[in-house]
């Protein structure tokens, strides 16, 4: 698995999963626009953790999050520990002749934090930790607040546990502003943006080379330009070029270019259009004012085009 443009984060995570002491990056909040590779980074981190002997679970911020976190943790930890919680109880009692029956049955279900503590204790006995990743965070989900609050206590208890959460920038901001999880403001903040063109080019070349296939230099350059630094677009371009190439080791230029076109249309439909539809009328006016410039836009210029003051444009941007 090739992960382009995120070397520093990947290296720090890898060190953290193998370190005897706790590192800040084990509690991280990842933010970025659609298509910047948030989910891919979470997936890569999970693979890293498993290689280092951790148990990892993938979660989505939806109702039922707490129980899903526990059930998935038990399931993924099954190869490390036995999570069956059973106790003995008297099931029958007879008088003359006296008889007592003993059976095994499930105990009364304790609270979520208690069950998670038992799980973490048993993992610790085996030298293993637990990584929870939560994608598409929904800041107004009560269970997310409960989970992060309990996680803070796990950290204070010096348990071997990690939490990586990812979401769109405005959702991340709303979560961090929640007073009940203020400790997250001290978490590692990872902001994902575009990847440099040379990183994209190297990743494409390495991917095809490792698989014994080739694409011409000219088409690689076209692909890099079409990708524009977006990790998800890189996935789409690579996949479609590969598929259009059929079984040929040397992918013909025409087929590779068709793959680039298909990826571009898919990116517009899956990423750009939903992002645009979420914008407010003023958001769209702001963007239209920016589009008049070929390079970076000055806030003073945008304010003039919108008929607003410089201070308004500054506040709106922030």
What are these regions (language model features)?
Residues 1-26, 72-75, 82, 91:
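A short, basic N-terminal segment
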Residues 23-44:
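Walker A/P-loop nucleotide-binding motif
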Residues 43-48, 236:
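Active-site signature of alpha/beta-hydrolase-fold catalytic machinery across serine-
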Residues 46-64:
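Conserved catalytic segments around the Walker B and adjacent sensor/switch elements
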Residues 103-170, 177-180:
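Conserved Walker B catalytic segment
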Residues 188-199:
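Conserved AAA+ ATPase "SRH/arginine-finger" region at the nucleotide-binding site
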Residues 205-270:
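Amphipathic alpha-helical "lid/sensor" segments that cap RecA-like P-loop NTPase cores
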Residues 218, 265-318:
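C-terminal leucine-rich, beta-strand-based interaction scaffolds used for sensing/assembly
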């Amino acid at each position: 698995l090739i992960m382009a443009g995120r070397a520093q984060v990947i290296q720090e995570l890898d060190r953290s999963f193998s370190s005897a002491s706790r590192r800040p990056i084990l509690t991280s909040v990842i933010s970025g626009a659609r298509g910047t590779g948030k989910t891919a980074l979470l997936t890569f981190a999970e693979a890293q953790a498993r290689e280092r002997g951790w148990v990892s679970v993938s979660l989505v911020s939806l109702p039922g999050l707490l129980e899903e976190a526990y059930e998935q943790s038990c399931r993924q930890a099954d190869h490390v520990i036995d999570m069956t919680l059973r106790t003995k109880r008297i099931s029958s009692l007879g008088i003359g002749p006296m008889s007592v029956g003993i059976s095994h049955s499930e105990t009364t279900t304790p609270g979520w934090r208690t069950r998670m503590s038992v799980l973490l204790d048993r993992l610790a006995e085996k030298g293993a930790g637990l990584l929870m990743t939560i994608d598409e965070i929904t800041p107004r989900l009560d269970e997310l607040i409960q989970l992060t609050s309990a996680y803070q206590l796990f950290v204070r208890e010096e348990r071997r546990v990690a939490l990586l959460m990812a979401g769109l920038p405005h959702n991340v901001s709303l979560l961090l502003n929640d007073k009940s999880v203020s400790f997250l403001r001290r978490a590692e903040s990872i902001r994902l943006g575009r990847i440099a063109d040379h990183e994209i080019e190297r990743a494409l070349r390495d991917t095809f080379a490792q698989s014994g296939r080739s694409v011409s230099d000219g088409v690689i350059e076209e692909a890099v330009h079409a990708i524009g630094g977006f990790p998800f677009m890189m996935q789409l371009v690579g996949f479609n070029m590969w598929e259009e190439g059929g079984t040929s080791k040397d992918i013909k230029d025409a087929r590779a270019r068709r793959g680039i076109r298909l990826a571009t249309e898919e990116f517009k439909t899956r990423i750009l259009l939903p992002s645009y539809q979420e914008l407010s009328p003023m958001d769209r006016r702001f963007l239209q004012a920016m589009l008049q410039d070929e390079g970076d836009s000055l806030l003073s210029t945008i304010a003039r085009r919108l008929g607003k003051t410089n201070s308004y444009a500054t506040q709106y941007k922030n």
